[in-house]
Amino acid sequence: MSSSQKKAGGKAGKPTKRSQNYAALRKAQLPKPPALKVPVVKPTNTILPQTGCVWQSLGTPLSLSSFNGLGARFLYSFLKDFVGPRILEEDLIYRMVFSITPSHAGTFCLTDDVTTEDGRAVAHGNPMQEFPHGAFHANEKFGFELVFTAPTHAGMQNQNFKHSYAVALCLDFDAQPEGSKNPSFRFNEVWVERKAFPRAGPLRSLITVGLFDEADDLDRH
Protein backbone atom coordinates (compact mmCIF):
# COMPACT_ATOMS: atom_id res chain seq x y z
CA MET A 1 0.00 0.00 0.00
CA SER A 2 1.36 3.37 -1.04
CA SER A 3 1.70 6.30 1.32
CA SER A 4 -1.27 7.99 -0.36
CA GLN A 5 -3.37 4.88 0.12
CA LYS A 6 -2.38 4.73 3.77
CA LYS A 7 -3.54 8.30 4.21
CA ALA A 8 -6.81 7.56 2.43
CA GLY A 9 -7.77 4.26 4.01
CA GLY A 10 -5.27 3.48 6.75
CA LYS A 11 -5.17 4.65 10.35
CA ALA A 12 -4.49 8.29 10.93
CA GLY A 13 -0.97 9.05 12.06
CA LYS A 14 -0.06 10.84 15.29
CA PRO A 15 -0.72 14.59 15.25
CA THR A 16 2.36 16.67 14.73
CA LYS A 17 3.60 19.19 17.27
CA ARG A 18 2.54 21.95 14.91
CA SER A 19 -1.03 20.64 14.70
CA GLN A 20 -1.13 20.25 18.48
CA ASN A 21 -0.03 23.85 18.96
CA TYR A 22 -2.64 24.98 16.44
CA ALA A 23 -5.39 23.04 18.23
CA ALA A 24 -4.34 24.49 21.58
CA LEU A 25 -4.41 27.99 20.12
CA ARG A 26 -7.88 27.43 18.68
CA LYS A 27 -9.11 26.12 22.04
CA ALA A 28 -7.72 29.16 23.86
CA GLN A 29 -9.49 31.48 21.44
CA LEU A 30 -12.90 29.87 21.96
CA PRO A 31 -15.27 31.88 24.19
CA LYS A 32 -15.36 30.59 27.74
CA PRO A 33 -18.72 29.69 29.28
CA PRO A 34 -19.99 32.17 31.87
CA ALA A 35 -18.81 31.48 35.40
CA LEU A 36 -21.41 30.17 37.80
CA LYS A 37 -22.23 32.50 40.67
CA VAL A 38 -21.82 30.31 43.71
CA PRO A 39 -22.80 31.73 47.11
CA VAL A 40 -19.73 32.57 49.16
CA VAL A 41 -19.39 30.87 52.51
CA LYS A 42 -18.20 33.43 55.05
CA PRO A 43 -16.68 32.61 58.44
CA THR A 44 -18.94 33.38 61.34
CA ASN A 45 -19.09 32.98 65.08
CA THR A 46 -22.78 32.22 65.07
CA ILE A 47 -24.24 29.74 67.49
CA LEU A 48 -25.94 27.93 64.62
CA PRO A 49 -24.43 24.79 63.06
CA GLN A 50 -22.04 25.56 60.22
CA THR A 51 -22.79 22.54 58.04
CA GLY A 52 -25.01 23.49 55.14
CA CYS A 53 -25.13 27.20 55.93
CA VAL A 54 -25.20 29.42 52.87
CA TRP A 55 -24.53 33.14 52.81
CA GLN A 56 -26.39 35.38 50.41
CA SER A 57 -25.65 39.06 49.92
CA LEU A 58 -27.95 41.76 48.62
CA GLY A 59 -25.11 42.84 46.34
CA THR A 60 -25.57 46.59 46.73
CA PRO A 61 -25.39 48.63 49.93
CA LEU A 62 -28.65 49.60 51.55
CA SER A 63 -28.99 53.18 52.78
CA LEU A 64 -31.53 54.16 55.41
CA SER A 65 -32.36 57.67 56.53
CA SER A 66 -34.51 58.92 59.37
CA PHE A 67 -36.42 61.93 58.07
CA ASN A 68 -38.65 62.43 61.09
CA GLY A 69 -36.64 60.98 63.95
CA LEU A 70 -38.92 57.95 64.08
CA GLY A 71 -36.44 55.63 62.45
CA ALA A 72 -36.43 53.80 59.16
CA ARG A 73 -38.02 50.47 58.44
CA PHE A 74 -37.36 47.90 55.81
CA LEU A 75 -38.85 44.62 54.74
CA TYR A 76 -37.21 41.35 53.80
CA SER A 77 -39.12 38.77 51.80
CA PHE A 78 -38.00 35.17 51.64
CA LEU A 79 -39.46 33.25 48.72
CA LYS A 80 -39.35 29.64 49.73
CA ASP A 81 -39.21 27.24 46.82
CA PHE A 82 -39.16 23.71 48.15
CA VAL A 83 -38.64 20.63 46.07
CA GLY A 84 -38.61 17.35 47.84
CA PRO A 85 -39.98 15.90 51.05
CA ARG A 86 -42.41 17.55 53.40
CA ILE A 87 -40.67 19.72 55.93
CA LEU A 88 -41.30 21.40 59.23
CA GLU A 89 -41.18 25.15 59.50
CA GLU A 90 -38.86 24.86 62.47
CA ASP A 91 -36.33 23.19 60.18
CA LEU A 92 -35.46 26.60 58.77
CA ILE A 93 -33.20 28.97 60.64
CA TYR A 94 -32.26 32.41 59.35
CA ARG A 95 -29.49 34.68 60.52
CA MET A 96 -29.14 38.30 59.44
CA VAL A 97 -25.92 40.22 59.88
CA PHE A 98 -25.89 43.99 59.48
CA SER A 99 -22.76 46.02 58.95
CA ILE A 100 -23.67 49.62 59.67
CA THR A 101 -21.80 52.91 59.32
CA PRO A 102 -21.52 54.70 61.65
CA SER A 103 -21.62 52.29 64.55
CA HIS A 104 -24.84 53.02 66.36
CA ALA A 105 -27.06 51.48 68.98
CA GLY A 106 -30.41 50.75 67.42
CA THR A 107 -33.42 48.62 68.21
CA PHE A 108 -34.78 45.87 65.99
CA CYS A 109 -38.32 44.64 66.11
CA LEU A 110 -40.43 42.30 63.99
CA THR A 111 -44.07 41.93 63.13
CA ASP A 112 -45.30 38.48 64.07
CA ASP A 113 -48.00 38.18 61.41
CA VAL A 114 -46.67 38.67 57.89
CA THR A 115 -48.30 37.37 54.73
CA THR A 116 -48.28 38.09 51.01
CA GLU A 117 -50.93 39.34 48.61
CA ASP A 118 -50.55 39.12 44.85
CA GLY A 119 -46.84 38.46 45.18
CA ARG A 120 -46.36 41.58 47.33
CA ALA A 121 -45.20 41.36 50.91
CA VAL A 122 -47.81 42.59 53.37
CA ALA A 123 -47.21 43.04 57.08
CA HIS A 124 -49.95 42.90 59.69
CA GLY A 125 -49.91 43.62 63.37
CA ASN A 126 -47.95 46.06 65.47
CA PRO A 127 -44.53 46.68 63.91
CA MET A 128 -43.18 48.22 67.11
CA GLN A 129 -43.58 45.18 69.32
CA GLU A 130 -40.69 43.28 70.82
CA PHE A 131 -38.95 40.82 68.54
CA PRO A 132 -40.77 37.55 69.27
CA HIS A 133 -38.92 35.00 67.16
CA GLY A 134 -35.25 35.61 67.81
CA ALA A 135 -32.55 37.40 69.69
CA PHE A 136 -30.68 40.58 68.84
CA HIS A 137 -26.94 40.62 69.55
CA ALA A 138 -24.16 43.14 69.20
CA ASN A 139 -21.48 41.81 66.88
CA GLU A 140 -18.11 43.54 67.06
CA LYS A 141 -17.06 42.30 63.64
CA PHE A 142 -20.21 43.04 61.65
CA GLY A 143 -22.21 45.57 63.66
CA PHE A 144 -25.60 44.05 64.35
CA GLU A 145 -26.60 40.42 64.37
CA LEU A 146 -30.06 38.97 64.45
CA VAL A 147 -30.72 35.24 64.81
CA PHE A 148 -34.23 33.90 64.46
CA THR A 149 -36.22 30.92 63.30
CA ALA A 150 -39.04 31.06 60.81
CA PRO A 151 -42.25 32.28 62.48
CA THR A 152 -44.72 29.48 63.13
CA HIS A 153 -48.21 30.04 61.79
CA ALA A 154 -51.20 28.00 62.91
CA GLY A 155 -51.85 25.07 60.63
CA MET A 156 -48.62 25.49 58.69
CA GLN A 157 -46.66 22.63 60.22
CA ASN A 158 -46.01 19.48 58.22
CA GLN A 159 -46.95 21.05 54.91
CA ASN A 160 -45.18 21.84 51.69
CA PHE A 161 -44.73 25.58 51.34
CA LYS A 162 -45.54 26.93 47.90
CA HIS A 163 -45.90 30.53 49.01
CA SER A 164 -43.55 33.21 50.24
CA TYR A 165 -43.47 34.77 53.63
CA ALA A 166 -41.88 38.03 54.67
CA VAL A 167 -40.04 39.23 57.72
CA ALA A 168 -40.64 42.88 58.52
CA LEU A 169 -37.89 44.50 60.53
CA CYS A 170 -37.65 48.06 61.73
CA LEU A 171 -34.60 49.95 62.94
CA ASP A 172 -35.38 52.68 65.45
CA PHE A 173 -32.75 55.27 66.20
CA ASP A 174 -33.31 55.38 69.94
CA ALA A 175 -29.78 56.46 70.78
CA GLN A 176 -29.11 59.24 68.31
CA PRO A 177 -25.67 60.87 68.34
CA GLU A 178 -25.62 64.15 70.23
CA GLY A 179 -26.59 67.10 68.04
CA SER A 180 -28.05 64.90 65.28
CA LYS A 181 -31.80 65.20 64.71
CA ASN A 182 -32.13 63.17 61.51
CA PRO A 183 -29.26 60.71 61.32
CA SER A 184 -28.56 58.66 58.22
CA PHE A 185 -27.12 55.19 58.43
CA ARG A 186 -25.68 53.14 55.62
CA PHE A 187 -25.95 49.38 55.61
CA ASN A 188 -22.68 48.37 54.00
CA GLU A 189 -23.68 44.75 53.70
CA VAL A 190 -26.69 42.72 54.68
CA TRP A 191 -26.31 38.97 54.70
CA VAL A 192 -28.81 36.24 55.21
CA GLU A 193 -27.54 32.93 56.43
CA ARG A 194 -29.94 30.06 56.12
CA LYS A 195 -29.67 26.66 57.72
CA ALA A 196 -31.83 23.88 56.36
CA PHE A 197 -31.75 20.45 57.89
CA PRO A 198 -30.95 17.61 55.44
CA ARG A 199 -34.54 16.40 55.32
CA ALA A 200 -35.69 19.83 54.16
CA GLY A 201 -34.40 19.20 50.65
CA PRO A 202 -33.24 21.90 48.22
CA LEU A 203 -34.00 25.46 49.25
CA ARG A 204 -33.84 28.68 47.26
CA SER A 205 -34.33 32.06 48.87
CA LEU A 206 -35.13 35.24 46.98
CA ILE A 207 -34.39 38.41 48.93
CA THR A 208 -36.21 41.64 48.17
CA VAL A 209 -36.06 44.89 50.06
CA GLY A 210 -38.57 47.67 50.53
CA LEU A 211 -37.92 50.82 52.52
CA PHE A 212 -40.46 52.39 54.86
CA ASP A 213 -39.81 55.95 56.00
CA GLU A 214 -43.14 56.83 57.59
CA ALA A 215 -44.20 55.63 61.01
CA ASP A 216 -47.39 53.95 59.76
CA ASP A 217 -46.12 52.52 56.47
CA LEU A 218 -46.21 48.97 57.72
CA ASP A 219 -49.74 49.41 59.06
CA ARG A 220 -50.98 50.81 55.75
CA HIS A 221 -49.50 47.97 53.75
Curated annotation (Swiss-Prot):
InterPro entries to which the protein is assigned, alphabetical: Coat_Ilarvirus (IPR002681)
Predominant subcellular localization, coarse grouping: virion
Region span, Disordered: 1-24
Keyword set, alphabetical order: Acetylation, Capsid protein, Host-virus interaction, Ribonucleoprotein, RNA-binding, T=3 icosahedral capsid protein, Viral nucleoprotein, Virion
GO CC annotation: ribonucleoprotein complex; T=3 icosahedral viral capsid; viral nucleocapsid
PTM sites of type N-acetylserine: 2
Molecular-function GO terms, alphabetical: RNA binding
Entries under Pfam families matching the protein: Ilar_coat
Location within or outside the cell: Virion
Homology family: Belongs to the alphamovirus/ilarvirus capsid protein family.
Subunit details: Interacts with Arabidopsis ALKBH9B.
Role of this protein: Capsid protein. Binds to the to the 3' end of the nonpolyadenylated viral RNA and is involved in viral RNA translation initiation. Probably binds RNA and plays a role in packaging.
Stated name of the protein: Capsid protein
Provenance organism: Alfalfa mosaic virus (strain 425 / isolate Leiden)
